[in-house]
From Swiss-Prot:
Glycosylation sites: N306
Subcellular locations according to the entry: Secreted
GO MF terms held by the record: serine-type endopeptidase inhibitor activity
Gene: Serpini2
Family (UniProt): Belongs to the serpin family.
Pfam name, any one: Serpin
Organism: Mus musculus (Mouse)
Tissue: Expressed in pancreas.
GO CC, alphabetical: collagen-containing extracellular matrix; extracellular space
Keywords per UniProt: Glycoprotein, Protease inhibitor, Secreted, Serine protease inhibitor, Signal
Protein name per UniProt: Serpin I2
Signal peptide range: 1-18
SMART domains reported for this sequence: SERPIN
Matching InterPro entries: Serpin_CS, Serpin_dom, Serpin_fam, Serpin_sf, Serpin_sf_1, Serpin_sf_2
Length: 405
C-alpha cells in the first residue's frame, strides 16, 4: 500500500489537525455502522467505530484493487487530501496513555492468519507501527486450541475484563483470516453521583413493560440541549469524565418520540449538531446504572455497507501475503462498558443531592426509557463507542449482526 493512501487513512482520525470535512467522516461512518448493526439488534447495542475503523485499516494496509477501494469508499476516504505525514491515530493513543491514572482504556487488536501462510515483513512492521496491532499465526484446524489462544491473548490485553471471547465452534477448516478487536473502558465522572441517592425506579422498555433498575440521581452542571426536527424530538446531555479527556453523550427521545424514530432519522449532521450546540446549565439527571458486554461479528454489517470483496475467495490481499487463498473469515469485536456512580474520592467533585420535591422550573433529564449514547474523545471528537440501552437489566448480549444470514 502506498504512503499517500496510508497517510490518508491516518488523517481520517484527525479532529483539530485537519479540515472539518475529515471530522465529518468519523461521524458519518459511526452512524452508518450503527444503522447496519441495529437492523438485527433490537435490544442493547454497543460497538466501537474507532475499533472497527482500525480493523478495516489493518486490512487496507495489505489490500489492493477492489478490496482496497471498497474500504476507502465506506470510510469516505477517497479523495482525502494526502501528503501530511502526521499520524493522528498515534496522537490519540499518546493522549490517552499520558492520563492512564484518570481512566482505564484498553484496546486490543490483532490479525490471526492460518498457519502455513507467510506474512510479509513490511506488513508486520506497518501493522505494528500504525495500529499497535499484533499479527499472529494459528492453526484454525485445531479450533479448540485456537479459540483458547486468542481468548487468552484478549484477556491479557484487557486486564482480565474481557474473557472467553471465542469458542471452538467459531472456527473451521475454511477459516483463513480473523480480525479481532476487544475494548474496555471505565472512567471516573468529573461530577460523580452519590451512591446513597441511587434508588430502584421503573424503566419503561420498548414494548411498554417496565423493569426495576438502579437509577442514579444528581443535580449537575452539564452540557445540555433540546432538539426537535420533523418527528424526532430529543434531549441531549453530555457528561464529562475526570480530566476532560472523554465524555458520554446521551440522546434521550422525548416521550412522544420512539427510539425507532430516532434510529431511522438520525444522521451524522444531527450528531455534529448535538456536539456543537449544547450549552451549560443545571440539570436534574436521572440515569440508570448499567453494564453492557457485547460481542459482534461485524461481517454482515460491513457487507451491508458494501465492504464485500475482502470476504471473497480470490480477493487481493497481496500486501499481507502472496497467497491468493487468503480472505477475511470473521471481523470480531467485543466491548465491555460500564456506567455507575463511581468517581475519584480525592479530586472529583460531586453532584448535588436532589431534594424530594423537585423544582418545576429545573431542567430534568429522566432516562427512564430507551436512549442512545456516544462515548467520545473530547479533543478530537473521535467516537470510541456508540450504542443504545433498551433494557438496563440486560448485561450481556451476543450474536451476529444479521442472525438470519
Amino acid at each position: 500500500m502506498n504512503k499517500t493512501i496510508l497517510w490518508s487513512f491516518l488523517l481520517f482520525f484527525s479532529g483539530s489537525q485537519t479540515s472539518r470535512a475529515t471530522d465529518q467522516k468519523i461521524a458519518d461512518f459511526a452512524v452508518d455502522l450503527y444503522k447496519a448493526i441495529s437492523l438485527s439488534h433490537k435490544n442493547n447495542i454497543i460497538f466501537s467505530p474507532l475499533g472497527t475503523t482500525m480493523l478495516l485499516g489493518m486490512v487496507q494496509l495489505g489490500a489492493k484493487g477492489k478490496a482496497q477501494q471498497q474500504i476507502l469508499k465506506t470510510l469516505r476516504m477517497r479523495g482525502t487530501p494526502a501528503g501530511e505525514e502526521f499520524s493522528v491515530l498515534k496522537s490519540l493513543f499518546s493522549a490517552i496513555s499520558k492520563k492512564k491514572q484518570e481512566f482505564t482504556f484498553n484496546l486490543a487488536s490483532a490479525l490471526y492468519l492460518q498457519e502455513g501462510f507467510i506474512v510479509k515483513e513490511t506488513y508486520l512492521h506497518s501493522n505494528k507501527e500504525f495500529f499497535q496491532s499484533a499479527t499472529k499465526l494459528v492453526d484454525f484446524l485445531d479450533a479448540k486450541t485456537s479459540a483458547q489462544a486468542i481468548s487468552t491473548w484478549v484477556e491479557s490485553k484487557t486486564d482480565g475484563k474481557i474473557k472467553n471471547m471465542f469458542s471452538e465452534e467459531e472456527f473451521g477448516p475454511l477459516t483463513r483470516l480473523v480480525l479481532v478487536n476487544a475494548i474496555y473502558f471505565k472512567g471516573d465522572w468529573k461530577q460523580k453521583f452519590r451512591k446513597e441517592d441511587t434508588e430502584m425506579t421503573d424503566f419503561t422498555k420498548k414494548d411498554g413493560s417496565t423493569v426495576k433498575v438502579p437509577m442514579m440521581k444528581a443535580l449537575l452542571r452539564a452540557q445540555y440541549g433540546y432538539f426537535s426536527q420533523s418527528s424526532m424530538t430529543c434531549q441531549v446531555l453530555e457528561l464529562p469524565y475526570k480530566a476532560d479527556e472523554f465524555s458520554l453523550v446521551i440522546i434521550l427521545p422525548t416521550e412522544d418520540t420512539s427510539i425507532e424514530e430516532v434510529e431511522n432519522q438520525v444522521t451524522a449532521p444531527h450528531v455534529r449538531r448535538w456536539f456543537s450546540e449544547l450549552h451549560e446549565e443545571e440539570v436534574e439527571v436521572s440515569l440508570p446504572r448499567f453494564k453492557i458486554e457485547q460481542k459482534l461479528d461485524l461481517k454482515e454489517a460491513l457487507y451491508s455497507l458494501n465492504v464485500t470483496e475482502i470476504f471473497s475467495g480470490g480477493c487481493d490481499l497481496s500486501g499481507i501475503t502472496d497467497s491468493s487463498e487468503v480472505y477475511v473469515s470473521r471481523v470480531m469485536q467485543k466491548v465491555f462498558f460500564e456506567i455507575n456512580e463511581d468517581g475519584s474520592e480525592a479530586a472529583a467533585s460531586t453532584g448535588i443531592n436532589i431534594p424530594a420535591i423537585m423544582s418545576l422550573t429545573q431542567t430534568q433529564f429522566l432516562a427512564n426509557h430507551p436512549f442512545l449514547f456516544i462515548l467520545k474523545h473530547i479533543r478530537t471528537e473521535s467516537i470510541l463507542f456508540m450504542g443504545k440501552v433498551t433494557d438496563p437489566d440486560i448485561q450481556t448480549t451476543k450474536g451476529r449482526d444479521l442472525d438470519s444470514l
